[in-house]
């Protein structure tokens, strides 16, 4: 039976269509989102052997869209080192641009902001909320859109930082250093090998280090969290993102405010998200809204026809999944 593996087991040494750095003519929505995504770095110590492990991941600011926030969503395995360590044995940092490390592989002074874990799912579905512990760790929050409202064929963009190997000589962790890839939503799937977690299957390539990062729609709303890939003999062109609804549930449990965009409702918060995503005044935003609606309809019809000719079958079962730090 085919098996779904964690990103650590994928053949990410193969070239993937991810672009590093901000490109000329980049979509303003993506350029805006870069300011909200952060590079995370963790270290765990085994209390018995004293052996230390390191990992990296990605997170993004949540709260009232466009306002500064020190609260971030990421994956549970990024925040905790996959739960391998006892309480107090894990340290987590938000890396700043041009971060440097000392001889013990800890971030040098001024290179990072210490973080604390607020709440996690304690395993599947692999989600965590963390908080940066100094003002330098604040970023503008992104709006969230329930994943179930995102139809097949929707254009999406994945953002993330490179994995641990990229930190050997320091870390380029600024907004301009993010890797970006684009694709479309292919399917909604309950991932049996990951605790029946609800996921979006998409074609925006992700690689090691993307774990916990955002999957955006064309309005700049986070519709899912990049977490898993598939074993190479299943697919090297499909990728898996957790429903953002899991992150919303954690925010609700802590009574933390955030901007939720609902496609089925014309609400002030939805319109505020449009203004934030495009940086436009109200009059121009309404014009853009009408134009976007027409464009989405035309593109959607074309993608629907293509999707019918390319059915996707993804077998479940096998080993338990788990993203890579």
Task: Explain the meaning of each model-derived region.
Residues 25-26, 43-75, 235-238:
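A conserved glycine-rich beta-strand in the N-terminal activation segment of trypsin-fold
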Residues 60, 66, 151, 205-226:
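Catalytic nucleophile loop of clan PA
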Residues 140-198, 206-208, 228-237, 310-311:
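Flexible, gly/ser-rich surface segments that form the specificity/activation loops bordering the active-site cleft
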